[in-house]
Amino acid sequence: MQEIVGYLVKNPEVLDEVMKGRASLLNIDKDQLKSIVDAFGGLQIYTNGNWVPS
């Protein structure tokens, strides 16, 4: 799970596609996906990797 979160932090465009339902994460069940999306939902991530609370 940590590798997936790290990848999404480094590649925010992928996170955006996942959150919009246009991409999926392999080997992640729907409960795990919901946890990931919920965790990132309160954050705004810029392409340079800086996290800014929304």
Swiss-Prot record:
Residue ranges the record assigns to the propeptide: 1-46
Q: Lipoprotein among the record's keywords?
A: yes
The entry's comment on post-translational modification says: Trp-51 is modified by isoprenylation, probably by geranylation, which is essential for activity. Modified by the tryptophan prenyltransferase ComQ before export to the extracellular environment. The type of isoprenyl derivative differs among the different pherotypes and depends on ComX primary sequence.
Q: What is its main location?
A: secreted
Q: Which GO terms describe its cellular component?
A: extracellular region
Where are the 3'-geranyl-2',N2-cyclotryptophan lipid anchors? W51
A Gene Ontology biological process term? establishment of competence for transformation
Keyword Oxidoreductase (UniProt)? no
Keyword set for this entry? Answer: Competence, Lipoprotein, Pheromone, Prenylation, Secreted
Output one GO MF annotation.
Answer: pheromone activity
Q: Which InterPro entries match?
A: Competence_ComX_Bacillus
List localization entries. Answer: Secreted
- Miscellaneous: The DNA sequences encoding ComQ, ComX and the N-terminal two-thirds of ComP show a striking polymorphism, which determines the specificity of the quorum-sensing system in the different pherotypes of Bacillus. In ComX, the sole conserved residue is the modified tryptophan essential for the activity.
Q: What interactions and quaternary structure are annotated?
A: Interacts directly with the sensor histidine kinase ComP and stimulates its activity.
Role noted for this protein: Part of a major quorum-sensing system that regulates the development of genetic competence. Acts through the activation of the two-component regulatory system ComP/ComA composed of a sensor histidine kinase, ComP, and a response regulator, ComA.
Q: Tell me what this protein is called.
A: ComX pheromone
